[in-house]
């Protein structure tokens, strides 16, 4: 073994297997780009992002950890969200939940 060497298992790795997902169409109504990270509670994103917020409650972007999606001003795109796991207790972000989902 070499320090830092990666030894992935054979085959494909499926992210968030078996978890509930939902797709939402998002429009950036602002005049600046907005970037949303992989583990940000999507319901609590920047108010300039227009989408069905209630559909996103308890969900985050279904992308690899440590990555993000950027929404340019005036851009509309559909993204897939995945249900938050664990105890499903949310604190911080924009302070809209501050407890159990």
From Swiss-Prot:
Cellular compartments annotated: Cytoplasm
Keywords (A to Z) from UniProt: Cytoplasm, Hydrolase
Descriptive protein name: Urease subunit beta
Signal sequence, start to end: none
Family indicated by similarity: Belongs to the urease beta subunit family.
Main location: cytoplasm
Pathway membership, UniProt: Nitrogen metabolism; urea degradation; CO(2) and NH(3) from urea (urease route): step 1/1
EC numbers, comma separated: 3.5.1.5
GO molecular function annotation: urease activity
